[in-house]
Amino acid sequence: MDLDMTAHIGGVAYGSLHDGPGQRTVLWFAGCSIRCAGCVNPHLFAPDSGRSAPLREVGHVLMEGINRRDQGVTFVGGEPFDQPQALAELCEHVAQYWASWPNVPRLIVYSGYTFEQLKSRRNSDVERALNTADVLVDGPFVQKWADEDLGYRGSRNQRVIDLAETRSTGEVAMLDWDRPRIVIRRGQIISSPSISRRLGLAATSTRHCGELTPEPAAVSA
């Protein structure tokens, strides 16, 4: 990994159950050229949002997730593919140091670009990221297709793509992650906002998938 390269990072969270299967470390990339209407993180649109951090520092932040017994990593934004070189370096870092768990993707990347748009770039760093990640959740958030019960998607146009299977077969292979989720951890009930409202769970943790709330910390030395 090019340790001196910098990336614009919006924040990090550990122990997340909202951003993919298993207990995950989540890293928010700052800056987004797509700027979907209704995005849960509009404060990460600006290229200079978040802070600039060397990949050496970001790598240490990701390694802390292993110390906390997280099972996988999720990259969200902002738009991770707006920083393709930094994204590729960090994808390879995760692949090198994080173990594989049964039924838990090691690395999930969210993007407002479709898989086909990313492939059409013919960019070597984009290809490195796509060849390293396990799952890509692709496509822009579209308000008219929004559904809080989609699990790990925001709107119905978005796809959960099994990148390993796609690489193997040459055809886009999709996963079904849309089952409603209720998780109980250390006495706290964690679910989607719509399930919480229907069940009247006032004390529930209801962060939207991919949402950067005040709880995640900024990347710091």
What are these regions (language model features)?
Residues 2-17, 66, 112-113, 119-221:
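Auxiliary Fe-S-binding modules of radical SAM enzymes
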Residues 7-10, 23, 38-128:
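Conserved Radical SAM active-site core
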Residues 7-35:
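N-terminal pre-triad scaffold of radical SAM enzymes
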Residues 20-22, 31, 38, 63, ...:
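Glycine-centered flexibility motif
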Residues 26-33, 86-93, 149:
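Short low-complexity stretches enriched in small and charged residues
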Residues 27, 36, 79, 136:
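Conserved, mostly hydrophobic/aromatic
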Residues 29, 77-80, 195:
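Short loop or secondary-structure boundary microenvironments that flank
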Residues 35-39, 163:
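Residues that scaffold the ATP/ADP-binding catalytic core of kinase and kinase-like folds
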